[in-house]
């Protein structure tokens, strides 16, 4: 059975194409997306850190307000990452460990009749963002994941993670999986993002711990 799956009818700039995976391994941290303004998550430092928690994002549009329940236009996730400030020979800030479980509940994003489910198999890098407007802390991290619906694996992913104080509805989160063209990102400060490219949480909470 072919592992090619194309999802059409996807709103805004979000596209998904689930394709066969490559045998090559790329452990390099991914660059922020091009083609738009990015005023946060450009300056980083390797330092001990820990980010924990989970949440819900009602994207699109990614504001603090929840979409109508019947629409199923939202995403949920659980995620954590821990780093001790170690750097490899290429200057990459190494992660000690981490996890990500991501579910996109939008009907148009279903794969094989089920919500799109992304599962991290390896978290390789984590760096503290020193320029993001996240009052308690911000982290850019990522690694490799698997599409649970298809078994497609060894896909690079990165997330932008923002703890913007309490309550959690001021926090933000964004994800990108370039090899399948999947992104959930927000770009309008004061409307749908506390710090580009993160989208406001409509549920849950992110907790930044500067050391562990």
Where are these regions (language model features)?
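Edge beta-strand at a domain terminus
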Residues: 179-212
């Amino acid at each position: 059975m072919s592992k090619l799956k194309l999802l059409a009818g996807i709103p805004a700039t979000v596209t998904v194409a689930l394709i066969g995976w490559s045998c090559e391994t790329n452990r390099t941290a991914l660059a922020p997306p091009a083609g738009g303004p990015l005023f946060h998550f450009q300056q980083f430092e390797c330092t001990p850190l820990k980010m924990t928690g989970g949440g819900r994002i009602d994207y699109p549009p990614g504001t603090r307000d929840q979409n109508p329940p019947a629409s199923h236009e939202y995403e949920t996730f659980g995620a954590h990452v821990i780093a001790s400030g170690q750097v490899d020979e290429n200057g990459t800030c190494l992660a000690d460990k981490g996890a990500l479980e991501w579910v996109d509940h939008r009907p148009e994003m279903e794969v094989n009749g089920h919500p799109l489910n992304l599962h991290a198999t390896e978290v390789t890098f984590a760096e503290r963002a020193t320029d993001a407007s996240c009052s308690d802390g911000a982290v850019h991290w990522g690694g490799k994941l698997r599409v649970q619906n298809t078994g497609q694996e060894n896909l690079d992913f990165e997330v932008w993670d923002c703890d913007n104080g309490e309550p959690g509805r001021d926090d933000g989160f964004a994800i990108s999986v370039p090899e399948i063209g999947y992104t959930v990102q927000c770009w309008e400060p004061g409307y749908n993002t506390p710090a580009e490219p993160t989208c406001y949480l409509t549920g849950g909470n992110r907790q930044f711990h500067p050391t562990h």
